[in-house]
Amino acid sequence: AQYRVSEQNPVPIARNIIAAKIQASKRVLQRQIRNYGENEAIQSAVDALNISLRQLKGAAELDVVRGIEGDAAARYFCVFGQLLSEKSGFSFDGRNRRPPRDGVNALLSFVYSILGKDISGALQGVGLDPQVGFLHADRPGRDSLAQDILEEFRAWWADRLVLSLINRGQIKPQDFVTEASGAVSLKAEARKLLFQALQAKKQEKIVHPFLGEEVEIGLLPYIQAMLLARHLRGDLSEYSPFLMR
Protein backbone atom coordinates (compact mmCIF):
# COMPACT_ATOMS: atom_id res chain seq x y z
CA ALA A 1 0.00 0.00 0.00
CA GLN A 2 2.87 2.38 0.80
CA TYR A 3 4.37 2.02 -2.68
CA ARG A 4 0.98 2.45 -4.37
CA VAL A 5 0.05 5.60 -2.43
CA SER A 6 3.54 7.04 -2.92
CA GLU A 7 3.18 6.66 -6.68
CA GLN A 8 -0.52 7.29 -7.22
CA ASN A 9 -1.81 9.63 -4.52
CA PRO A 10 0.91 11.16 -2.33
CA VAL A 11 -0.63 14.65 -2.11
CA PRO A 12 -3.08 14.24 0.85
CA ILE A 13 -0.37 12.88 3.17
CA ALA A 14 2.23 15.41 1.96
CA ARG A 15 -0.26 18.26 2.41
CA ASN A 16 -1.16 17.19 5.96
CA ILE A 17 2.51 16.92 6.96
CA ILE A 18 3.38 20.35 5.56
CA ALA A 19 0.31 21.97 7.15
CA ALA A 20 1.52 20.64 10.52
CA LYS A 21 5.07 21.85 9.85
CA ILE A 22 3.94 25.38 8.94
CA GLN A 23 1.59 25.55 11.96
CA ALA A 24 4.42 24.45 14.27
CA SER A 25 6.83 26.99 12.71
CA LYS A 26 4.22 29.72 13.16
CA ARG A 27 3.82 28.80 16.83
CA VAL A 28 7.56 29.08 17.46
CA LEU A 29 7.42 32.65 16.08
CA GLN A 30 4.21 33.54 17.95
CA ARG A 31 5.77 32.33 21.18
CA GLN A 32 8.62 34.81 20.66
CA ILE A 33 6.12 37.68 20.23
CA ARG A 34 4.22 36.52 23.32
CA ASN A 35 7.38 36.39 25.44
CA TYR A 36 9.26 39.43 24.14
CA GLY A 37 6.63 41.77 22.71
CA GLU A 38 5.60 42.92 19.24
CA ASN A 39 8.15 42.52 16.46
CA GLU A 40 7.24 43.73 12.98
CA ALA A 41 9.50 41.34 11.05
CA ILE A 42 8.37 38.29 13.03
CA GLN A 43 4.69 39.30 12.76
CA SER A 44 5.12 39.71 9.01
CA ALA A 45 6.56 36.17 8.80
CA VAL A 46 3.59 34.85 10.85
CA ASP A 47 1.20 36.56 8.39
CA ALA A 48 3.08 34.99 5.46
CA LEU A 49 2.81 31.53 7.06
CA ASN A 50 -0.95 32.04 7.46
CA ILE A 51 -1.15 32.78 3.71
CA SER A 52 0.89 29.60 3.02
CA LEU A 53 -1.59 27.57 5.09
CA ARG A 54 -4.51 28.97 3.10
CA GLN A 55 -2.75 28.22 -0.21
CA LEU A 56 -2.01 24.69 0.97
CA LYS A 57 -5.71 23.86 1.39
CA GLY A 58 -6.25 24.13 -2.37
CA ALA A 59 -2.97 22.47 -3.43
CA ALA A 60 -3.75 19.45 -5.60
CA GLU A 61 -0.27 18.74 -6.99
CA LEU A 62 2.90 17.65 -5.25
CA ASP A 63 5.05 20.36 -6.83
CA VAL A 64 2.63 23.00 -5.55
CA VAL A 65 2.84 21.55 -2.01
CA ARG A 66 6.65 21.54 -2.24
CA GLY A 67 6.67 25.12 -3.51
CA ILE A 68 4.47 26.32 -0.64
CA GLU A 69 6.69 24.46 1.84
CA GLY A 70 9.83 26.05 0.37
CA ASP A 71 8.37 29.56 0.56
CA ALA A 72 7.18 29.05 4.14
CA ALA A 73 10.57 27.67 5.26
CA ALA A 74 12.33 30.67 3.67
CA ARG A 75 10.06 33.14 5.52
CA TYR A 76 10.55 31.31 8.82
CA PHE A 77 14.35 31.13 8.57
CA CYS A 78 14.46 34.76 7.42
CA VAL A 79 13.52 35.81 10.99
CA PHE A 80 14.93 32.80 12.90
CA GLY A 81 18.05 34.79 13.84
CA GLN A 82 15.84 37.21 15.78
CA LEU A 83 14.90 34.38 18.14
CA LEU A 84 18.53 34.21 19.36
CA SER A 85 19.35 36.35 22.39
CA GLU A 86 21.79 39.14 21.58
CA LYS A 87 24.09 38.23 24.44
CA SER A 88 24.46 34.63 23.16
CA GLY A 89 27.15 35.75 20.69
CA PHE A 90 25.51 33.75 17.86
CA SER A 91 24.18 35.15 14.62
CA PHE A 92 22.17 33.50 11.86
CA ASP A 93 21.92 34.69 8.27
CA GLY A 94 19.75 31.91 6.88
CA ARG A 95 19.80 28.16 6.56
CA ASN A 96 22.85 26.49 4.99
CA ARG A 97 23.94 22.84 5.09
CA ARG A 98 26.13 20.19 3.49
CA PRO A 99 28.26 21.49 5.09
CA PRO A 100 26.86 23.91 7.69
CA ARG A 101 28.88 27.14 7.71
CA ASP A 102 28.04 28.55 11.14
CA GLY A 103 27.28 27.31 14.64
CA VAL A 104 23.49 27.63 14.51
CA ASN A 105 23.28 25.69 11.24
CA ALA A 106 25.69 23.06 12.59
CA LEU A 107 23.40 22.55 15.61
CA LEU A 108 20.23 22.39 13.50
CA SER A 109 21.77 19.89 11.06
CA PHE A 110 23.08 17.74 13.91
CA VAL A 111 19.70 17.51 15.68
CA TYR A 112 17.79 16.97 12.42
CA SER A 113 20.15 14.15 11.53
CA ILE A 114 19.73 12.38 14.91
CA LEU A 115 15.93 12.68 14.76
CA GLY A 116 15.95 11.47 11.14
CA LYS A 117 17.76 8.29 12.20
CA ASP A 118 15.29 7.75 15.07
CA ILE A 119 12.39 8.11 12.61
CA SER A 120 13.97 5.67 10.11
CA GLY A 121 14.25 3.06 12.86
CA ALA A 122 10.64 3.67 13.94
CA LEU A 123 9.36 3.29 10.36
CA GLN A 124 11.19 0.00 9.93
CA GLY A 125 9.78 -1.10 13.28
CA VAL A 126 6.20 -0.78 11.98
CA GLY A 127 6.99 -2.42 8.64
CA LEU A 128 7.25 0.70 6.45
CA ASP A 129 10.06 1.41 3.99
CA PRO A 130 11.92 4.56 5.17
CA GLN A 131 13.15 5.23 1.62
CA VAL A 132 9.73 5.55 -0.04
CA GLY A 133 8.24 8.94 0.80
CA PHE A 134 5.24 11.05 -0.17
CA LEU A 135 6.66 14.57 -0.03
CA HIS A 136 10.38 14.05 -0.65
CA ALA A 137 11.35 12.45 -3.94
CA ASP A 138 12.96 9.00 -3.73
CA ARG A 139 16.73 9.21 -4.12
CA PRO A 140 19.23 6.39 -3.71
CA GLY A 141 20.56 6.37 -0.16
CA ARG A 142 18.03 8.88 1.16
CA ASP A 143 15.37 7.89 3.69
CA SER A 144 12.69 10.01 2.02
CA LEU A 145 9.83 8.88 4.27
CA ALA A 146 11.90 9.60 7.39
CA GLN A 147 12.54 13.09 5.97
CA ASP A 148 8.78 13.48 5.45
CA ILE A 149 7.96 12.68 9.09
CA LEU A 150 10.89 14.80 10.30
CA GLU A 151 9.09 17.85 8.89
CA GLU A 152 6.53 17.52 11.70
CA PHE A 153 9.25 17.69 14.36
CA ARG A 154 11.66 20.31 13.02
CA ALA A 155 10.19 23.47 14.57
CA TRP A 156 8.51 22.05 17.67
CA TRP A 157 11.30 19.70 18.74
CA ALA A 158 14.64 20.41 17.02
CA ASP A 159 14.52 24.19 16.51
CA ARG A 160 13.18 24.89 19.99
CA LEU A 161 15.85 22.66 21.56
CA VAL A 162 18.62 24.50 19.66
CA LEU A 163 17.18 27.90 20.62
CA SER A 164 16.98 26.95 24.27
CA LEU A 165 20.58 25.62 24.40
CA ILE A 166 21.88 28.82 22.80
CA ASN A 167 19.71 31.31 24.70
CA ARG A 168 20.46 29.71 28.06
CA GLY A 169 24.17 29.90 27.32
CA GLN A 170 24.63 26.12 27.50
CA ILE A 171 26.29 26.10 24.09
CA LYS A 172 28.62 28.97 23.18
CA PRO A 173 30.30 30.19 19.97
CA GLN A 174 33.63 28.73 21.15
CA ASP A 175 32.12 25.20 21.16
CA PHE A 176 32.67 24.89 17.39
CA VAL A 177 35.57 24.29 15.02
CA THR A 178 35.82 25.64 11.48
CA GLU A 179 37.58 23.43 8.94
CA ALA A 180 39.74 24.85 6.16
CA SER A 181 36.80 24.15 3.80
CA GLY A 182 34.59 26.52 5.83
CA ALA A 183 32.54 23.65 7.30
CA VAL A 184 31.62 24.21 10.95
CA SER A 185 31.20 21.35 13.41
CA LEU A 186 30.68 20.83 17.14
CA LYS A 187 33.57 20.06 19.46
CA ALA A 188 33.31 16.73 21.32
CA GLU A 189 32.25 18.26 24.67
CA ALA A 190 29.45 20.27 23.09
CA ARG A 191 28.29 17.26 21.10
CA LYS A 192 28.03 15.31 24.35
CA LEU A 193 26.01 18.13 25.93
CA LEU A 194 23.69 18.19 22.92
CA PHE A 195 23.13 14.42 23.14
CA GLN A 196 22.33 14.75 26.86
CA ALA A 197 19.86 17.58 26.17
CA LEU A 198 18.16 15.46 23.50
CA GLN A 199 17.95 12.46 25.82
CA ALA A 200 16.45 14.62 28.58
CA LYS A 201 13.91 16.02 26.11
CA LYS A 202 12.94 12.50 25.02
CA GLN A 203 12.06 11.61 28.61
CA GLU A 204 9.67 14.53 29.03
CA LYS A 205 5.98 13.69 28.75
CA ILE A 206 3.22 15.36 26.75
CA VAL A 207 -0.39 14.51 25.96
CA HIS A 208 -0.37 13.29 22.36
CA PRO A 209 -2.75 15.52 20.36
CA PHE A 210 -4.29 12.63 18.38
CA LEU A 211 -4.20 9.78 20.91
CA GLY A 212 -5.15 11.98 23.88
CA GLU A 213 -2.77 9.94 26.07
CA GLU A 214 0.34 10.93 27.99
CA VAL A 215 3.46 9.72 26.17
CA GLU A 216 7.20 10.29 26.34
CA ILE A 217 8.49 12.63 23.64
CA GLY A 218 11.04 9.96 22.66
CA LEU A 219 8.15 7.72 21.54
CA LEU A 220 6.75 10.27 19.08
CA PRO A 221 8.62 8.95 15.99
CA TYR A 222 7.24 5.46 16.71
CA ILE A 223 3.69 6.77 17.34
CA GLN A 224 3.65 8.77 14.08
CA ALA A 225 5.06 5.79 12.16
CA MET A 226 2.31 3.62 13.64
CA LEU A 227 -0.43 6.15 12.74
CA LEU A 228 0.89 6.34 9.18
CA ALA A 229 1.01 2.54 8.88
CA ARG A 230 -2.59 2.32 10.15
CA HIS A 231 -3.71 4.89 7.58
CA LEU A 232 -1.94 3.06 4.74
CA ARG A 233 -3.57 -0.21 5.81
CA GLY A 234 -6.98 1.49 5.70
CA ASP A 235 -7.59 1.51 9.48
CA LEU A 236 -7.57 5.33 9.64
CA SER A 237 -9.25 7.53 7.02
CA GLU A 238 -6.37 10.01 7.00
CA TYR A 239 -2.90 10.46 8.44
CA SER A 240 -2.83 12.83 11.42
CA PRO A 241 0.62 14.43 11.59
CA PHE A 242 2.05 15.49 14.94
CA LEU A 243 0.96 18.98 15.93
CA MET A 244 0.73 20.20 19.50
CA ARG A 245 -2.45 22.15 20.15
Predicted regions and their residues:
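Active-site helix-to-loop segments that bind/position phosphate- or nucleotide-bearing substrates
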Residues: 2-245
